[in-house]
Amino acid sequence: MTKLKIKSGDTVRVIAGDHKGQEGKVQKVLIEKNKAIVEGVNMISKHEKPSASNPQGGIKEKEAPIHISNLSLIDKNGDTTRVGYKEEDGKKVRFSKKSNEVI
């Protein structure tokens, strides 16, 4: 299993696939599938049956998972960057390899 360098709450840009160039915030990371759900990216239509809580039913838009190899982290400067790890004050922290700033 590979090390996931993207976490929930990170801002990412899609670098490959149909949604290339779109940006969004990571809502959830699916570790076992190496995928992430990104806000506003890879939208799908979900057909819902009428139920007691939703008597109308209908078609809902929702985000589908996207593979993490198609995502790149955006640092504070707005550039895509790779992620590195270093120790600071005895704690392991992530840092941007482009700007060398702690994420």
From Swiss-Prot:
Q: Which GO terms describe its molecular function?
A: rRNA binding; structural constituent of ribosome
A Gene Ontology biological process in which this protein takes part is: translation
Source taxon at top rank? Bacteria
Record bears the keyword Kinase: no
Its GO CC terms? ribonucleoprotein complex; ribosome
Q: Which UniProt keywords apply?
A: Ribonucleoprotein, Ribosomal protein, RNA-binding, rRNA-binding
Q: Which InterPro entries match?
A: KOW, Rib_uL2_dom2, Ribosomal_uL24, Ribosomal_uL24_CS, Ribosomal_uL24_KOW, Translation_prot_SH3-like_sf
Tell me the first and last residues of the signal peptide. Answer: none
Q: What does this protein do?
A: One of two assembly initiator proteins, it binds directly to the 5'-end of the 23S rRNA, where it nucleates assembly of the 50S subunit.
For this chain, the family text in UniProt reads: Belongs to the universal ribosomal protein uL24 family.
Q: What is this protein called?
A: Large ribosomal subunit protein uL24
